[in-house]
Regions:
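Extended extracellular/luminal ectodomain segments enriched in beta-structured repeat modules
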Residues: 22-24, 104-106, 114-121, 185-187
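Disordered, acidic Ser/Thr/Pro-rich linker "stalks" and the adjacent N-terminal cap
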Residues: 43-114, 130-132, 155-156, 165-168, ...
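Single conserved hydrophobic/aromatic residue that forms the stacking wall/gate
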Residues: 1-10
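Edge beta-strands of jelly-roll/beta-sandwich modules across compartments, strongly enriched
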Residues: 35-46, 198-210
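Extended, low-complexity, turn-rich repeat/linker tracts enriched in Gly/Pro/Ser/Thr and Asp/Glu
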Residues: 35, 127-135
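Short, surface-exposed beta-strand/strand-loop-strand elements in extracellular ectodomains
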Residues: 132-145
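Noncatalytic modules at the cell exterior or secretory-pathway interfaces
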Residues: 19-33, 182-196
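A short beta-strand element within beta-rich, extracytoplasmic domains
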Residues: 27-29, 117-128, 192
Length: 210
């Protein structure tokens, strides 16, 4: 065991930096002498043992692997981060769904991996989306380090295409392999474009961290 922060005087709310930044798996909070707290949040980065970095065939674009949603232009019916979940979709609300577009254009979102990766298979699941799945979608990637999310969002329109526009069907799993994937370059961020709108339940990138 090690102490990551000493005794803190409570305020409403209170925030502080940890005394060290070593990887950890568990947190214990001690109240002096008693009382209650409403929320505890620990901010940081997902850390993965080196032995797992070269393991092939994992979903590098999942919350379990440390991926996160940065931005979506529309999350009217469901959050973009839902498509990173490991568990099977529970309902339409468990996916990412945008409102019907009345104006030109398409909906899109930006995702970040926990570390650089390469992909060999892409899976898109439209489970539960029957009359409201996107007609087509495409994927783009970029290798970015030490940039603010705001600048990443702005630059995403010019990223390298990973998958050209592909048709989607209702309530089914779609798989795209090496013959569909345009490049095998290492990347850290993904942009998904759906045309024109709609919902998907899950997006998986099967590959390896490098």
């Amino acid at each position: 065991d090690r102490t990551v922060t000493g005794v803190q005087t409570c305020a409403l709310p209170i925030s502080f930096e940890c005394a060290e930044s070593q990887p950890l798996t568990h947190l214990r909070i001690t109240l002096h002498p008693d009382g209650g707290i409403a929320r505890l949040r620990a901010y940081g980065e997902f850390w993965e043992e080196e032995r797992d970095s070269n393991f092939d065939g994992i979903n590098v674009l999942s919350k379990e692997s440390g991926a996160r949603a940065i931005y979506a232009n529309d999350e009217h019916f469901g959050c973009l981060s839902n498509i990173l979940e490991k568990h099977e979709p529970l309902s339409m609300a468990d996916g990412w769904e945008t409102r019907r577009r009345r104006e030109p254009g398409n909906d899109w979102g930006v995702l970040a991996l926990s570390k650089p990766a390469q992909v060999e298979k892409i899976i898109v699941d439209t489970k539960f989306f029957k009359g409201n799945f996107p007609h087509t979608f495409s994927l783009s990637t970029a290798y970015i380090v030490n940039e603010e999310d705001s600048s990443i969002i702005e630059s995403s329109q010019s990223w390298t295409k990973l998958l050209e526009r592909q048709k989607l069907g209702m309530n089914q799993i779609h798989t795209f392999d090496k013959k569909d994937i345009i490049h095998n370059e290492t990347f850290t961020h993904v942009r998904i474009d759906i045309y024109p709108d709609g919902g998907i339940a899950r997006l998986k990138f099967i590959g390896k961290f490098v």
